[in-house]
Amino acid sequence: MELLFEIGMEEIPARFLNQALEDLKSNFEKKLKNNRIKFDGVRTYGTPRRLVLVADEVAGMQEDLDELSIGPSRERAYKDGALTKAGEGFLKAHRIEEEQIEIIKNDKGEYIAFKRFLKGKPTEAILPEILKALVLEETFQKSMRWSTKTIRFARPIEWFLALYGGKVIDFEIEGIKSSNKSKGHRFFGKEFEVSSVENYLKKIRENNVIIDISERRKMIEEMINNSLLEDEKADVDKALLDEVTNLVEHPFAIVGTFSEEFLEVPQEVLIISMKVHQRYFPILNKKGKLLPKFIVIRNGIDFSENVKKGNEKVLSARLADARFFYYEDLKIPLDNNVEKLKTVVFQKDLGTIYNKVKRCEKIAEFLVGKLKYNYMKEDILRTVKLAKADLVSNMINEKEFTKLQGFMGENYALKAGEEIGVALGIKEHYYPRFQGDLLPSGIEGIIAGISDRIDTLVGCFGVGVIPTGSKDPFALRRTALGIVNIIINANLDISLKDLVKVSLDALEEDKVLKTDRAKVETDVLDFLKQRIINVFTDMKYRKDVILAVLDKDSDNITTALEIVKVITEKLSKDKMQALLQVVKRVSNIMKGNKDVTIKEKLFKTDIEKTLYAESKKVESEVEQAIKEKEYADYFEKLFTLVPTIDKYFETVIVMDEDKNVRDNRIGQLTYIMNLFEKIAYLNKLD
């Protein structure tokens, strides 16, 4: 038989709906299984005003329970005819008396046991408690009590519709009784009786409620597209579409307009006002320029001039505020804002944003020299100085436009006559803001972005603010990933150790370090290494290749990536496979030996002498290849040793009876192994 359960309530926040339905479904399925009630499937529907659950083919009876619980052995359960603690524990666990115990025999001996048989009950007798529990156990990010009730829910509950096989499942929670009645749209529907799931689905639609979330979303998308002229497009992102879908029971799209005067303000400001503050969809032309139009999705079934005018009025007030803040900000020089950063706390132990900017300037100056951008030093340091200036602007500071940090800084900088690269760098130093985001394109934004992130990362580690499990209040994992991705994208030749050290120097000058400097350095570098592993893994490189390279040296990200690429390309070659076989064999013989003392007078065979001469020649060649960053050539040089090493193993017994000869041969192989491991631990490759 089919089951229908609807929790009717005052409108809950849109962000609560999907999780509430997911929890309702999983909890119901769990309870049916725990109660031995078979069912075919469970599906959910939802609007801000109702959570709906439908279950198909729910069995009319519980299954009988016939189980045997085996406890400890008879020997452990009894001593001198009396129960031991083990025996008493078995009784307690099963809530039974000693008389209910049986002794059973199996291949392992005699054991105490308890046989239980429970006759299944009618499902309709069990469902009331199950449905009550579903309501009482439903949790939300925030919940409330109302009236004199003790129950907590996202919003006050108004009704329960509960049917099983067409009959009402009777239950009550603090005066709210279940029934066969539901309610339609708050303004365009009425109360109605329900006799079945099919009947409910028909009547709920007749009462202007679209309970299927995916159907509502599709309707909204179609309505938006149908509202556009040929040369227009709407700014529709998934998050806003999902939110609006969960704000209405029946969508209807209305096109509104606003004064063209507001287009003087950067369109990103207007778009934020519409999307974030009002949940409207902005309309743009095909080139991406904002038009003085928007789409609002009303919770209704038809056009309303009053709704249109009301939304236009609200938006105009919003945009007027934004325009006022914008022009007020243009009156204030950005340098003045830098001074105001002294009043904004970055982190309680690390000082203000102003302190942070000063540290970033020192890091940036180091990077300018290291990366040989001295000819752009003035613009780069100017970018770093102004990077956070917009945080204290009217537009950003407590004015609900925080998403525009960086963008507004760029705009104000351009209006103030700053260099284009400086302005762009102010915006781009925040890139990437999330996974898959843009990366800074100019060196100003690249250096400002790295300086900002390494100061945050090292600073937080330096005062003991370190991510643990799911807790990462300063988003340090994302910060470290940003450093790694910026360096890779810009192909920067830089030592992470040097970068961390210069950041530590700046923190020490500010006298804010609370943790041992050496420990901070080690911990930060390990943290960065793990992020490098993550990024390389996302790039689809083999884990063993990544670790072979990074366990050898993770200090220079671009160098490490180049080596990973070369090894990956070489792995498909027969020469590389032959080299790896030799590496494994040499590694097994060495067994961790580090001594490379070699005495030529102890060579007893010509092949030992030949291998030594060839390896000395290859050593100088591979060192030159590494110096020139020709890593493919490095491996080509190693390949030349393989035939000689193979011949060596065919004719030489390394474990000679003479200890001096044996040690000399192991030393020679250790020397060769060092050649193999100059840029990666090849013996770690599968």
Curated annotation (Swiss-Prot):
It is found in: Cytoplasm. Its EC number is 6.1.1.14. Its main location: cytoplasm. One of its GO terms (biological process) is glycyl-tRNA aminoacylation. One of its GO terms (cellular component) is cytosol. Belongs to the class-II aminoacyl-tRNA synthetase family. This is Glycine--tRNA ligase beta subunit.
